[in-house]
Amino acid sequence: VAAVKKLVEEDRVFALVGGLGTANNLGVMDYLVQNNVPHLAPATGSGMMANPVKKNVFQVQINYTIEGILLTQYALDKLGGKKLAVFYQNDVFGQEGLAAINAELKKRGLAEAVAVSYEAADTNFAAQALKLQTSGADTTILFAVPKPGASVIAEMNKIGYQPKVLASSVINDPSIFQLAGPGIEGLITDGWMPPHDDLTDPKI
């Protein structure tokens, strides 16, 4: 918040563009609204950014609630998942995703997903991988940032746990291929914009 206040009050910036992270963006949202500073393309899909609508907040990333519903529908309808688990970051980002997944399951008369959380500061995910394995879930959805998401995939692979794995678009970073190792094979994730360096795409 202090850094954004400096940008607005001392550097007199016209707008804030592409601020990274749910907690960071929510932390400065009210201040930017009160000061009529345009908040463009915040890097978060939290519904709290857009609901209620704010005149100077322009969110482009897919809403985590919508994303959670779509991932659940795909897991059940396309992959034939019978029992779901969710590995999620224990903050607004992960909690919104988990709530959406469970809402879709409830709508279908199904049991809630097995919820396995991690904290943003965690660096070892062996315990979470074991919890996911012992849950008996045949499908796991990740609402995680790249390093923890890729790391838990690697840990699951180490212990021979190979469920169908889907993930929020937040995980989409080239680093996950090295971090996750061979366990990355078969990962399904969504996207809300084409790669900016794909010169074969006429939209780019």
Language-model regions: role of each:
Residues 46-50, 55-160, 178, 197-203:
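Extracellular/periplasmic Venus flytrap/periplasmic-binding protein
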Residues 192-194:
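Early exported N-terminus immediately downstream of N-terminal targeting peptides
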